[in-house]
Every structure is written in structure tokens, then in C-alpha cells.
UniProtKB/Swiss-Prot annotation:
Signal peptide: 1-19
GO molecular function, one term: nutrient reservoir activity
Name this polypeptide is given: Prolamin PPROL 14E
Keyword Metal-binding attributed: no
Length: 150
């Protein structure tokens, strides 16, 4: 009799644990289905509310206009691109450091003008191939190397 009672308790505990896992699984799936923009808006919602309360702009017709909503969406898209562009800037920095190290390491032993030209060409073409550009706005007219000007 005691064994049956113990098995009944174990069965009840297993059923309740299974129900809890189902609820957790459903909430996790809903979390995964939410768009990143919606998640960003949920994170920033308390801050938006604070600004509206602080400055009393909740009833402003501009904030509810279609032009404002469009501009707001554009700002969110631009913010998403900032992280991507900073990644490309890091690539440019690594390329410049690698070139400096190569020149320091091999500059005294020998100088291969063709290699330097190929590296310079690569340094200018790689960023533009991926749609990213270094800090200057146009390509410089000359490139100075150890052997002279390219």
C-alpha cells in the first residue's frame, strides 16, 4: 500500500514538473519570435516614459506623426549599422599594423617594390570591396613606402 502511495506521489510530481517545463518552453519560444526592434523598444520603453513625464511631451502631435515614426525607424537602422562599421574599422587597423610590422621586420633585409605595391593595392581595394572606407574621403594621390613613392 505504501509503495502504491509513493508511486502516486511520484506521478503527481512528474506531471507538475512537466507542466512547468511546457510553460517555460512556450515563453522561451515567444521570446525567440520577437523581433530585435521590438526587444529594443521594450528595453528603451522605461526611458521613453521618463522623458515624456519629465518634459511633458506625451501629447505632442509631432511624436505621433508618420514623419516622426519614419525618422525614428531610420535612426534605429543607422544605430544597427554603427556596430558593423566599427568592426570594419578594426579590420583596417589590423591591416595597417600588419603592414608596419612587415616593414619593420623585413625593411632592413631587402625591399621588394612589387610586394609593396601589391600590399598598397590590397589595402585600398579590400575596404572598398566591402563597402567600407577609411577615415580619409578620397584616395591619396601618392603612397609613400620605404623605397620611394608609388
Amino acid at each position: 500500500m505504501k509503495i502504491i502511495f509513493v508511486f502516486a506521489l511520484l506521478a503527481i510530481a512528474a506531471c507538475s514538473a512537466s507542466a512547468q517545463f511546457d510553460v517555460l518552453g512556450q515563453s522561451y519560444r515567444q521570446y525567440q519570435l520577437q523581433s530585435p526592434v521590438l526587444l529594443q523598444q521594450q528595453v528603451l520603453s522605461p526611458y521613453n516614459e521618463f522623458v515624456r513625464q519629465q518634459y511633458g511631451i506625451a501629447a505632442s502631435p509631432f511624436l505621433q506623426s508618420a514623419a516622426f515614426q519614419l525618422r525614428n525607424n531610420q535612426v534605429w537602422q543607422q544605430l544597427a549599422l554603427v556596430a558593423q562599421q566599427s568592426h570594419y574599422q578594426d579590420i583596417n587597423i589590423v591591416q595597417a599594423i600588419a603592414q608596419q610590422l612587415q616593414l619593420q621586420q623585413f625593411g632592413d633585409l631587402y625591399f621588394d617594390r612589387n610586394l609593396a605595391q601589391a600590399q598598397a593595392l590590397l589595402a585600398f581595394n579590400v575596404p572598398s570591396r566591402y563597402g567600407i572606407y577609411p577615415r580619409y574621403y578620397g584616395a591619396p594621390s601618392t603612397i609613400t613606402t620605404l623605397g620611394g613613392v608609388l
